[in-house]
Amino acid sequence: MSSIKLIVGLANPGAEYAQTRHNAGAWYVDLLALRHNQQLKEESKFFGYTARLNLAGQDVRLLVPSTFMNLSGKAVAAMAGFYRILPEEILVAHDELDIPPGVAKLKLGGGNGGHNGLKDIQSKLGNNPNFYRLRIGIGHPGDKSKVTGFVLGNPPASEQTLIDDAIDESIRCTEVLLKEDITKAMNRLHSFKAGAQ
């Protein structure tokens, strides 16, 4: 059984970014709240939108920072500090260029893969990388110079469906993570591929 007390969905704020690939982490948290009949509400002291729910018998707080992506650590550190939540009790959901749409991966600790949101969170948690990451695949444009435009672009409908399916399965696997352990959650999530029969 894994103890997760805070689930964070990374995003850029504002309507113009809401449907961009970079906001995949927030899509996951929004759907998780919706599934539990909760609505994220703005809470200025945590620099973001928050909710609280009972997930697999555990008291879990949700957070979507309202800062820009590269300042996400400010919101995460504020909430973790206030509720005395340790890095290893935090799950951060984010978009992942190195994974195709329709696939998501779960891991504990590791590098930031050049993701500015993860970089800032790790820095604000005292350079402790030992938090859970839910990596939601968005695919790669194939050329490094196109990455910024790609992550800040909206996926076509076919890709959006695949990403949504992976998020849906990720929510089921989050419950497995909380009820059982990371190995079982990873085994299930890593064998899932949206669109595969």
Curated annotation (Swiss-Prot):
GO cellular component: cytoplasm
Catalyses which reaction(s): an N-acyl-L-alpha-aminoacyl-tRNA + H2O = an N-acyl-L-amino acid + a tRNA + H(+)
Stored SUPFAM superfamilies: Peptidyl-tRNA hydrolase-like (SSF53178)
PROSITE patterns named in the record: PEPT_TRNA_HYDROL_1 (PS01195), PEPT_TRNA_HYDROL_2 (PS01196)
GO biological process assignments: protein quality control for misfolded or incompletely synthesized proteins; rescue of stalled ribosome
GO molecular function: peptidyl-tRNA hydrolase activity; tRNA binding
Record site: Discriminates between blocked and unblocked aminoacyl-tRNA: 12
Assembly with partners or alone: Monomer.
PANTHER family in the cross-refs: PEPTIDYL-TRNA HYDROLASE (PTHR17224:SF1)
Family statement: Belongs to the PTH family.
Classification via Gene3D superfamilies: Peptidyl-tRNA hydrolase
Binding positions for tRNA per the UniProt entry: 17, 68, 70, 116
Annotated signal peptide: none
Localization terms from the record: Cytoplasm
Active site: residue positions: 22
Keywords: Cytoplasm, Hydrolase, RNA-binding, tRNA-binding
Organism encoding this protein: Yersinia enterocolitica serotype O:8 / biotype 1B (strain NCTC 13174 / 8081)
Described purpose of this protein according to its UniProt entry: Hydrolyzes ribosome-free peptidyl-tRNAs (with 1 or more amino acids incorporated), which drop off the ribosome during protein synthesis, or as a result of ribosome stalling.
Protein's name in the database: Peptidyl-tRNA hydrolase
Site keyed Stabilizes the basic form of H active site to accept a proton: positions: 95
